[in-house]
């Protein structure tokens, strides 16, 4: 019976490890969404404070930037997703970005709920594993006591 208990305990341990990995991946996803939200907030702030004639740094990639003068703030090019972009007025651009931020809020909330469920499941499995270990220890103690009693 002890062999079967060890096997069940090992299976629980593997399930716990898989749950922990899944939780970690979801938490990374949440962090990515929060970073994306921060980028959106920065973009909205830049749109609201930018004026024609302002000098900005334009990223070229690889950590390289070039300074450029903003010539026209009337139309802002906004990514719509799926490699599509569109020119938008300042107000419309802020609206599009706000909706993206709201969608990220929803995704974060859904993902956090999933994390919470998995953490709850993980706690239940940990409790089961602890109970199994205690039972196995008690059985070992009883067997030791019996064998000592048999020797006397």
Curated annotation (Swiss-Prot):
State what protein this is by name.
Answer: Prefoldin subunit alpha
Region spans: Disordered: 110-152
Citing just one GO molecular function, the answer is: unfolded protein binding
Give the quaternary structure: Heterohexamer of two alpha and four beta subunits.
Answer yes or no on keyword Transmembrane: no
A Pfam family (short name) is Prefoldin
One Gene Ontology biological process = protein folding
The gene coding this protein: pfdA
Family designation: Belongs to the prefoldin alpha subunit family.
Q: Where is the composition biased (Low complexity)?
A: 125-152
Q: Does the keyword Plastid apply?
A: no
**Where is this protein localized, as stated in its record?**
Cytoplasm
**Function, please?**
Molecular chaperone capable of stabilizing a range of proteins. Seems to fulfill an ATP-independent, HSP70-like function in archaeal de novo protein folding.
Keywords linked to the UniProt accession: Chaperone, Cytoplasm
Q: Which GO terms describe its cellular component?
A: cytoplasm; prefoldin complex
Acidic residues bias: where? 111-124
Gene3D superfamilies associated with the record: 1.10.287.370
């Amino acid at each position: 019976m002890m062999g079967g208990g060890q096997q069940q305990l090992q299976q629980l341990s593997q399930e716990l490890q898989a749950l922990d990995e899944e939780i970690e991946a979801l938490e990374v996803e949440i962090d990515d969404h929060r970073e994306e939200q921060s980028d959106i907030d920065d973009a909205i702030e830049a749109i609201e404070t930018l004026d024609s004639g302002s000098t900005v740094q334009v990223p070229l990639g690889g950590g390289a930037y070039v300074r450029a003068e903003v010539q026209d703030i009337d139309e802002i090019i906004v990514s719509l997703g799926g490699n599509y972009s569109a020119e938008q007025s300042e107000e419309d651009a802020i609206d599009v970005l706000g909706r993206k931020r709201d969608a990220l809020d929803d995704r974060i909330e859904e993902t956090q709920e999933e994390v919470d469920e998995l953490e709850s499941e993980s706690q239940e499995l940990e409790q089961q594993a602890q109970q199994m270990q205690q039972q196995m220890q008690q059985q070992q103690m009883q067997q030791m006591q019996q064998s000592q009693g048999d020797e006397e």
